[in-house]
């Protein structure tokens, strides 16, 4: 019997790619105006800083810290690190301003809660910005619990994050469904952790559903995919 449904956040409950694209454009323009670094060069520096941070931290939640990433970038570029907080502010403010719930998101959450199920978030990110996103999206009142990779000390598709989701839901993994847009990180990770896996694949074209994974094209299809509850 299904008792809880857990959702990935970025790319599942809102269009992360679209919001990120606008935020990245704003950040690139800011960096060019303040530091004279062209967008192409900034993109290369950003990729290098991301790689450096991942090597230094060995994974973990620090890789999601944009303030830290911009600090590393500025240090490598020989620029004042004092600009890092402003860079982070530009990025996050723009992303939040452009974050809009995907069609069916609010209705799906509300219907699940009305059916007596617990609703949670399972995300590879830090708690501070995920709470900010949920608040901006107007979804906070519909969420019972959240597990971030920061809290779990593990990133999807590692089992630990899914196990902690089930623990917070107060039920066994087999009594949980996990919904996400990443086949490997969300769907296969959840399936391998013993949960019902639902892959939100919004791309057009035929999709071969892996064994043990349900596929939906929109969150409007979720209630049917989960029935019978």
What do the PLM-derived regions correspond to, one by one?
Residues 1-5, 18, 40, 84, ...:
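Asp-based, Mg2+/Mn2+-dependent phosphohydrolase catalytic module
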Residues 2-103:
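N-terminal helical cap/lid subdomain that shapes the substrate entry/recognition surface
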């Amino acid at each position: 019997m299904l008792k809880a449904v857990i959702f990935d956040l970025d790319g599942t409950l809102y269009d992360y790619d679209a919001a990120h694209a606008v935020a990245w454009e704003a950040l690139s323009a800011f960096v060019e105006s303040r530091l004279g670094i062209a967008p192409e060069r900034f993109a290369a520096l950003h990729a290098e800083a991301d790689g450096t941070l991942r090597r230094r931290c060995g994974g973990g939640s620090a890789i999601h810290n944009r303030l830290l990433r911009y600090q590393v970038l500025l240090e490598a570029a020989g620029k004042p690190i004092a600009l890092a907080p402003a860079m982070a502010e530009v990025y996050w403010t723009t992303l939040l301003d452009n974050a809009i719930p995907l069609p069916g998101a609010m209705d799906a959450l509300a219907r699940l809660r009305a059916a007596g199920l617990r609703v949670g978030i399972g995300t590879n990110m830090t708690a501070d910005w995920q709470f900010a996103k949920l608040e901006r999206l107007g979804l906070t009142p519909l969420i019972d619990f959240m597990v971030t990779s920061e809290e779990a000390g593990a990133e999807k598709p590692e089992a630990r994050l899914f196990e902690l989701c089930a623990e917070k839901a107060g039920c066994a993994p087999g009594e949980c469904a996990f919904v996400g847009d990443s086949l490997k990180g969300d769907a296969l990770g959840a399936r391998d952790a013993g949960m019902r896996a639902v892959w939100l694949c919004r791309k057009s074209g035929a999709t071969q559903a892996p064994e043990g994974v349900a596929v939906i094209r929109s969150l409007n299809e979720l209630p049917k995919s989960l029935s019978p509850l």
